[in-house]
């Protein structure tokens, strides 16, 4: 990490751009192109001071009037010597500053490299580093609150407590191994089992929170399904209030899933417009239909659209394929195009929709009130749909300090640790030898340590930080 790096840290479109520079020669390098308007040179300034002056390139040609913030190691975001240059948000000015830095030997930062350096320099553990990306990507109050809680170390604190209990268990087991010939007991099996139960309970709670955390972070998944040409893409566009999906009278226009995020009453939803389900010999369309069924299986809420002009056999064929997959999911049955069909056809379609849920919808979370007519094109009864979505999300209130798992990597590590603890409990109950029980305990500790980055490979680190933006 001896190289000095730089990158634009702000998004395009504002009035000011911030260029971040970090590394051993950050202050020295910037001082070569920055002339303070009064006071000491940049290299003599104390940490966390902001200096006004001219940024010069091409000899001493003034490029812009800027503010330069100096942060000295280890009291910076990265833990290194750091400078932030706040300039006017001209793309030309920004480009010239970056080119000047590159000409002086500074390297363009890789995605997430500033945060990776913060992690490697001990400024934050890996779970808190990942929270930085979640904070930047947050689109709702709940997602923001979870990211802040993790960034402040709430999750790390929980993991630290778990690791301490596991270390206590391991040390007791290994002490007995060291004194096995002297028949010394450092803890009875009942006490060890009680400690295991406590650890099991906490890990289970954390792992169990992932379904909520993932929905908060990525949006509650809502699958829009039905036969071809029922208005699924029109409904997606109406929900998002923008033309995201292509709408056409030609059957099979949507051949792959189209997604969009929307926040309703503080809850983020991820709507998935899917390919229409029908019998087809088109290979590409069949692949799209298979993906429809996959997305439906992964969703929490399903919106089944029915075309009121379809006959009973068509409706039943679709219901037979879709409704069994909706088991355990919230379902709304929406008879679309109420603005263009006669009341009799509309009534028959609604009647058939209700019959099909009764016939094929075993285990589906559905009530008769969850069936109604809409016009996705005209917006008829869309307010009722939005109310249904918010009520169906069942998103618990998240308070400051709540620890909820939002990251797939963390969840998978917790599941592995939980399996290790169950092996320990089985071993203790069955009289398994102490060395084998200790090995399961050490595996649990390794899995928890992987979350905070204490035993993480370079490949995993690379994958994590590659998902960050350049300036982070």
Language-model regions, residue ranges each:
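Conserved beta-strand segments of alpha/beta enzyme cores
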Residues: 107, 268-270, 365, 370
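Redox-cofactor binding/interface segments in oxidoreductases and associated redox assembly factors
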Residues: 304-306
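Switch I (G2) and immediately adjacent beta-strands of P-loop GTPase domains
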Residues: 51-72, 252-280, 301
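Cytosolic ligand/metal-binding cores
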Residues: 286
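The start of beta-strands in P-loop NTPase/AAA+ ATPase cores
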Residues: 15, 243, 268-269, 302, ...
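Conserved G/P- and acidic residue-centered "switch" motifs that form tight phosphate/ATP-binding loops
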Residues: 122, 229, 273
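C-terminal-of-GTPase-core extension/linker across diverse P-loop GTPases
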Residues: 2-8, 141-263, 280-282, 294, ...
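A glycine-rich (often HGG/GG-containing) alpha/beta subdomain
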Residues: 1-145, 149, 153, 325, ...
